[in-house]
């Protein structure tokens, strides 16, 4: 991912595919200190630009905290890899990725288009 962070890139993937991406925030891996700094409000300006760009395409459910949302818009998550794979192949793909990248995780799923491009849960 480049500077659009997880939500920005998910937003672009969803629009480009005409589908809805469901992000399960509890499954997104972070560096241990990231939460602490975001909770104190230490965010780069790019996080606010990313929010401005994508937030109309994001529906937040299940009381996802503002801190979690901030982290998911944070461009410092750059360098990650966002992949969409068939659900039937997800576990096998994850196991293979985790051999090289232990923190790799399934962070969501894709459905046909719903009320918005991204559903953040």
What label would you give each PLM region?
Residues 1-121:
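Glycine-/charge-enriched secondary-structure boundary and capping motifs
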